[in-house]
C-alpha cells in the first residue's frame, strides 16, 4: 500500500513538473516575441502589411498586452482560450524567427528553425538588393492570393494597429 501511494505521489509530482516546464517555455516564447517586437517594430508592421492567415489569437493577445506596463502580460498565458501552440507555429513563418527562437532559449523544432533562418537570410539579401523592406516582405511572403488588395486592407489594418498600439 505504501509503495502504491509513493508511486502515485511521484507520478503527480512529475506531472506537475512537466506542466510547469510547458508553462515556462510558453512564458519564454511570449517574452521573446514581445521583446523582439519592441526592438523591431518597423519590421513587424511591414511584415503584417502583407501577411496572410494571421491567427486571431495574435490580434487578441496584442490587444490585451496593451493594458500591461510591465512583463506581467505573461499571466495571459493562464487563459485556456489562448492557443500558444498556434502562435508559436505562426511565429515560425516570420523571416526573423531565429531571433525569437534564440531569445526564447532555442525552443522549437529544427524544421521551424531552419525555415526561419532561411527566410531571414533571403529577406536580408532582398533588402540589400532592393533597398526596400516592404518589397522584401512581399517577396518572402509569396505571391499567391485569393482576393484583391481591398479584401486585405481591413483585417491587416486591424492586426497591424492592434500590434503597434499593444506592444509599444
From Swiss-Prot:
The keyword Methyltransferase does not apply. A lipid is attached at residue 143 (GPI-anchor amidated serine). It is an enzyme of class 3 (hydrolase). Pfam families: SRP1_TIP1 (PF00660). GO terms for molecular function: hydrolase activity. Induction: Expression is regulated upon white-opaque switching. Repressed by RIM101 and alpha pheromone, and up-regulated upon interaction with macrophages. Probable cell wall protein which may have esterase activity, with a preference for esters of fatty acids from 4 to 16 carbon atoms. This is Repressed By RIM101 protein 2. It comes from Candida albicans (strain SC5314 / ATCC MYA-2876) (Yeast). The lineage of its organism: Eukaryota, Fungi, Dikarya, Ascomycota, Saccharomycotina. The gene is RBR2.
